Amino acid sequence: MKSILITVAAALVVAASPGYAAGTKIQSTESGKPHMEFAPCPAKGRLRLFVRSGEIRIVGSDEARLSIDLSGRKSGQIQDVKARLTCSENSAELHVTGGPHNDLTITIHVPKNLDLYARVPAGEVSVEGITGNKDVELHAGELTIDVVNAKDYGHVDASVYAGEVDAEAFGDNKGGLFRSISKTAGGPYHLHAHVGSGQLTIR
């Protein structure tokens, strides 16, 4: 089931122009399908993700649109999985809720050149193939971030309250309580990564 909520003013603007007017927001919702696809959001800007706990893969794509694939042993029990995307002129926000927390992999395909902000309560999370700034936090579990090219980053801060930080991309590794790694270089991007309890890997 798909529903798109568009204000009358926004509809008039979209009809007259292929872009987004300042202040315009368009919201769409998908639910209960193994593949969910949304109309393209701006290819440049900031993407904010808020995803329920579980096995989550965030993957950069050459496509301008966002899409979600659900797979795993419980992929037949996804009736209450819901994804809500809100788009504006230069940013997007995606919320994913519902569904079984075990034996289900949620793969979120996003434009690879968006700055990424992501929050997940718990689980196994991976981020790959995305250039640009990254701000990713996981309360508990395993977080793996593929930085593509370490030389692209001007500032890096990575930390865990309890567990291990393995920042092999930047030549550092620390384990124990309140572990953190901070690097400053000449690249254009910023990386912030934090795990409350668990494993943080940056490669």
Regions found by a protein language model. Give the residues of each.
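A mature extracytoplasmic/lumenal domain signature
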Residues: V51-S53, G60-A64, L70-K74, G98-P100, ...
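Short, hydrophobic/aromatic-rich segments at coil-to-beta transitions
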Residues: R65-S67, S88-L94, L116
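Short acidic/polar N-terminal linker immediately downstream of export determinants
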Residues: L5-A9, P18-R65, R73-G76, G99-H109, ...
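A glycine-rich, hydrophobic loop/mini-helix early in the fold
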Residues: V81-P100
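Exposed beta-strand and adjacent loop surfaces of beta-rich binding modules
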Residues: R46, R65-S67, D80, D115, ...
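Active-site alpha-helical segments that house and flank conserved acidic catalytic motifs
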Residues: L47-F50, A118, V136, A158
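Short, T/G/N/S-enriched strand-turn elements that build extracellular solenoid repeat scaffolds
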Residues: H35-F38, E55-G60, V81-R84, T105-H109, ...
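Short, surface-exposed interaction patches in beta-rich subdomains
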Residues: Q27, S31-P42, S91, T97, ...
